């Protein structure tokens, strides 16, 4: 199975797999059962911003979700990613819909990772930034139902021609280049990711959510990972 670390924006509570009974953001380490969660006052139809950060000195993974003009939600978890992830990974965004549905639209996405070793010259870094997405993106690996639209947005799950979200959809987008996320001799390994998103839904209860995830380089959508499993995990263990 894939090795996954993720930050989830979970719009639909699945209490049977340990979700709190409200929309929440969470940190997932190798399982959909989040290690840490915080209540998320999701605002459908409004653009939100997610900022995720980690560094190997503090060994803390943190995420902040905010909408302009309202307070932000923060979640963090202490973890040494050297012990969890392979040295080389890919980073991506995933989303699903199920019986209930929502648009899982990504408007922008940026990422920076840095590895500093003791030698002065040796800093390994990777940076990318999408302010809009091209129609036939060469620098993204699109999986499942994910596609880029004519407005320059990345739609992670299916929408109709008129823009209505479709149910039972799963999609992911990964940056094409592998990321060197840690190294034994590194003094500091760190990364920052930011994305803006828009969730809209005709349903009273939108579902299921969006994630930022880090995985082994050959990661693919696991069979049966739709709905509550957010396109990341084959089961709810």
UniProtKB/Swiss-Prot annotation:
Keywords: Calcium, Hemagglutinin, Lectin, Manganese, Mannose-binding, Metal-binding, Vacuole. A carbohydrate binds at residues 12, 99-100, 228. The beta and gamma chains are produced by partial proteolytic processing of the lectin alpha chain by an asparaginyl endopeptidase. Its main location: other. The keyword Metal-binding applies. Mn(2+) binds at residues 8, 10, 19, 24. Hemagglutinating activity stable up to 60 degrees Celsius but diminishes with higher temperatures and is absent at 100 degrees Celsius. It comes from the Eukaryota. It is found in: Vacuole, Aleurone grain. GO terms for cellular component: aleurone grain; vacuole. Ca(2+) binds at residues 10, 12, 14, 19, 208. GO terms for molecular function: calcium ion binding; D-glucose binding; D-mannose binding; manganese ion binding. Homotetramer. D-mannose/D-glucose-binding lectin with hemagglutinating activity towards rabbit and human erythrocytes. In rats, elicits an acute inflammatory response by inducing neutrophil migration and induces dose-dependent paw edema. Binds one manganese (or another transition metal) ion and one calcium ion. The metal ions are essential for the saccharide-binding and cell-agglutinating activities. Belongs to the leguminous lectin family. This is Lectin alpha chain.
């Amino acid at each position: 199975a894939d090795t996954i670390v993720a930050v989830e924006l979970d719009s639909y509570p699945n209490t049977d797999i340990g979700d709190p009974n409200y929309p929440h953001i969470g940190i997932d380490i190798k399982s959909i059962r989040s290690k840490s969660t915080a209540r998320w006052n999701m605002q459908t139809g409004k653009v939100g911003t997610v900022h995720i950060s980690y560094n190997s000195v503090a060994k803390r993974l943190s995420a902040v979700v905010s909408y302009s003009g309202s307070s932000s939600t923060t979640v963090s978890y202490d973890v040494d990613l050297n012990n969890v992830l392979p040295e080389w990974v890919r980073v991506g965004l995933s989303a699903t819909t199920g019986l209930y549905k929502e648009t899982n639209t990504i408007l922008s996405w940026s990422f920076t990772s840095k590895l500093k070793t003791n030698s002065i010259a040796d800093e390994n870094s990777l940076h990318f930034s999408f302010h809009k997405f091209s129609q036939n993106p060469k620098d993204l690996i699109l999986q499942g139902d994910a596609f880029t639209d004519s407005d320059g947005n990345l739609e992670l799950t299916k929408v109709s021609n008129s823009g209505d979200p479709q149910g039972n959809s799963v999609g992911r987008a990964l940056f094409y280049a592998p990321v060197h996320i840690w190294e034994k001799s590194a003094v500091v390994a760190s990364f920052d990711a930011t994305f803006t998103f828009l969730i809209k839904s005709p349903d009273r209860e939108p579902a299921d959510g969006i994630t930022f995830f880090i995985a082994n380089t050959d990661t693919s959508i696991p069979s049966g990972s739709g709905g509550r499993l957010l396109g990341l995990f084959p089961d709810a263990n």
